[in-house]
């Protein structure tokens, strides 16, 4: 049992990296669409965002996925139960949103004290998951996090990164008026177990990743820049752009 609920499918002993797909967002800026549709099930070219993610991570080498839910959770449960990856997915419901770090801590046993991938399932992306994992395995000594970076057309709305010559993240500027560049945090990470220890050190259930955890690891984060497509589907405008920019293929390719 995880988080007070029995998962859809229980862990059956696979070896390999696990992933947490954060899918509990309400999507208030996408209303009225999200009044009746969970944000993670908002469609692009007829496919829910969550389906793109599940194909992406499983085809990229992830062995098992945990999906958290909150708003309109029964729809997410029903959708996952019918998908082709159902036997490798666990679901956990949050009556009260815990924040990214809080969700990790609430389900800490599920990660089996191993490194894991974390992503926000309300983004649309087609990055190289296998390459991302390989980059983490070859990260500089002492680094505990690998972060996906992408080039944004709207730097003021993103967390902008400053890197050194090794692609180590030295500074992180969250939605500032005059950002120093356009390389943005893609909100996809691989964490070593020690990152969970830092989350736990706050001593409370709600922990924010961007403002509380990431700053503690500056100088120990490798940036993996994707050349593929990546967009936060947080507004009606961004959803419209995704429909015009992203062409559905096996997972999707940038036109």
Regions found by a protein language model. Give the residues of each.
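Conserved N-terminal catalytic core of the sugar/cofactor nucleotidyltransferase
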Residues: 2-21, 29, 43-120, 124, ...
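Conserved beta-strand scaffold positions in the cores of enzyme catalytic domains, especially
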Residues: 41, 91, 145, 221-223, ...
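Short, well-ordered beta-strand micro-motif
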Residues: 43, 149, 162, 190-192
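Catalytic-core segments of class I nucleotidyltransferases/pyrophosphorylases
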Residues: 115-117, 124, 130-139, 153-155, ...
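A short, conserved acidic/glycine-rich loop-to-beta-strand motif
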Residues: 140-150
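Short acidic-glycine loop/turn motifs at beta-strand connectors
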Residues: 162-168
């Amino acid at each position: 049992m995880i988080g007070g609920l029995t998962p859809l499918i229980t862990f059956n002993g696979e070896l390999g990296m696990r992933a947490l797909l954060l899918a509990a967002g309400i999507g208030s800026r996408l209303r009225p669409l999200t009044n009746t549709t969970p944000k993670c099930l908002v469609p692009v070219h007829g496919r829910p965002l969550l389906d793109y993610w599940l194909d992406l991570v499983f085809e990229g080498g992830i062995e098992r996925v945990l999906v958290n839910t909150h708003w309109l959770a029964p729809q997410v449960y029903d959708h996952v139960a019918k998908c082709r990856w159902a036997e490798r997915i666990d679901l956990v419901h949050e009556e009260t949103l815990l924040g990214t770090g809080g969700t990790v801590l609430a389900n800490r046993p599920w990660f089996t004290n191993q490194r894991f991938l974390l992503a926000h399932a309300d983004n649309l992306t087609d990055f190289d998951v296998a390459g991302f994992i390989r980059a983490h395995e070859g990260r500089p000594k002492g680094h505990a996090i690998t972060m996906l970076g992408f080039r944004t057309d709207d730097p003021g709305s993103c967390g902008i990164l400053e890197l050194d010559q090794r692609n180590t993240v030295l500074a992180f500027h969250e939605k500032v008026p005059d950002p120093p560049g356009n390389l943005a945090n893609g909100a996809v990470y691989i964490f070593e177990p020690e990152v969970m220890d830092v989350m736990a050190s706050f001593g409370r259930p709600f922990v924010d990743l961007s403002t509380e955890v990431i700053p503690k690891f500056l100088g120990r984060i490798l940036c993996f820049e994707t050349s593929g497509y990546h967009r936060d589907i947080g507004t009606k405008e961004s959803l419209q752009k995704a429909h015009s920019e992203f062409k559905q293929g096996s997972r999707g390719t940038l036109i």
